[in-house]
Amino acid sequence: MQKLVAIKGMNDILPPDSARWEWLEDKVRTLMARYAYRNIRTPIVEPTPLFVRGLGEVTDIVEKEMYSFEDRLNGEQLTLRPEATAGVVRAVVEHSMLYDGGKRLYYMGPMFRHERPQRGRYRQFHQIGAEALGFPGAEADAEIILLAHALWAELGLENVRLELNSLGQPDERRAHRAALIAYLEQHMDVLDEDARRRLHSNPLRILDTKNPAMQALVEGAPRLIDFLGEASLQHFETVKAILDANGVVWSLNPRLVRGMDYYNLTVFEFVTDQLGSQGTICGGGRYDYLIEQIGGKSAPAVGWALGVERVLELLKEQEAQVARPAADAYAVVPDASALPVVMATLQRLRAQGVSVQMHSSTAAGEGMGSMKSQFKKADASGARYALVFGADELARGAVTVKPLRDSGEQAERPLAALAEWAATLQSSR
């Protein structure tokens, strides 16, 4: 029989690596609470038109990368979400969440894109994102950038650069688009096949080309920022001023356009040189027209998403210290006949918030194994203490508490007094 394995580019996340994911997620939840962002969870399957309408029909995601299929029950076209912003906006519109004012939301979860797997790019990947909906001011742009910047500090990440640009408003983009097309048409011999295909449908995306042969051409192209009106420029200047006041270092990247068509005004990316071609770890911007495009009443919004796999890879590259939670205690049980008393004791400790790992029997009917092997496993578990439930101790209604990591001598404690020990243990974490 053929061995069944995971789909290429869709990876299992196993212990102990999963502990790194939990550590990152816990850091994010704590930080989001400080900024008053609340969690939202949306389905991983959405109607295909949501992404076609929201992301743009001529984007790479919609044209090439979506996992789409027909529902066998009703013929509806469905898609595994390739990103989360469109789904969050759909939920906000469907449930009239902005009726009483703006909302700050965050999400975590898997996304899906049909592309060639490589380092930092997978078919199932995970994103964490923040969305501030209903806030028109430049201060909302700045705050959400500051939120991401604060996260890097919380995680201990270094050498992450912030790049900014402004895409202006639709009328400004139309003027720039005409100038850009006219410029590119003068250099048709330099354009690659993809650029020629995009020339009249989505020329702005040509500026984001990775083709080395087109870099000089792109560098000389008309800059969108030179077409911005006074209001757009003032919005951008306010964002930059707030970042400057907070000591956030940034650089202007006039070629930064992002991969979805829904952006306007501020766009940004946090990038690193340590992950090769997949150097963008977080990106986002303002999307004031997406809510209306999806069927809601016009409302402003701004947000970002980070790639979890890329952030964890960068943490590994920088050898950042990632806490790996271990049990507080490991129960050493020499005799299986003591298991009823032992397990009742461990349940009481767990109810008090103590994390306890219990040694299991080696095999059915073969006992609990030697004390030496149990202590070896206790030490390997990373637990701070071993709780030794020996026959002599249990006869006295006691247990031996042996430090494995902390300083101090082992001591015998009455089972009835373990509640006091548990309280002391928690206060010393």
Curated annotation (Swiss-Prot):
- Reactions catalysed: tRNA(His) + L-histidine + ATP = L-histidyl-tRNA(His) + AMP + diphosphate + H(+)
Q: Which keywords fit this entry according to its UniProt record?
A: Aminoacyl-tRNA synthetase, ATP-binding, Cytoplasm, Ligase, Nucleotide-binding, Protein biosynthesis
Q: Which GO terms describe its molecular function?
A: ATP binding; histidine-tRNA ligase activity
Sorted alphabetically, the Gene Ontology cellular component annotations on this record are: cytoplasm
Record InterPro entries: aa-tRNA-synth_II, aa-tRNA-synth_II/BPL/LPL, Anticodon-bd, Anticodon-bd_dom_sf, His-tRNA-ligase, HisRS-like_core, HisRS/HisZ
Where mainly found? cytoplasm
- Protein EC: 6.1.1.21
Extract the SUPFAM superfamilies matched here. Class II aaRS ABD-related, Class II aaRS and biotin synthetases
Q: Where in the cell is it found?
A: Cytoplasm
Q: Does the keyword Transmembrane apply?
A: no
Pfam families on file: HGTP_anticodon, tRNA-synt_His
Q: Which PROSITE patterns match?
A: AA_TRNA_LIGASE_II
An example Gene Ontology biological process: histidyl-tRNA aminoacylation
Show the stretches that span the lipid bilayer.
none
Q: Which PANTHER family match?
A: HISTIDINE--TRNA LIGASE, MITOCHONDRIAL-RELATED, HISTIDYL-TRNA SYNTHETASE
Give the protein family: Belongs to the class-II aminoacyl-tRNA synthetase family.
Assembly and interactions? Homodimer.
Protein name listed in UniProt: Histidine--tRNA ligase
State the organism's lineage: Bacteria, Pseudomonadati, Pseudomonadota, Betaproteobacteria, Burkholderiales
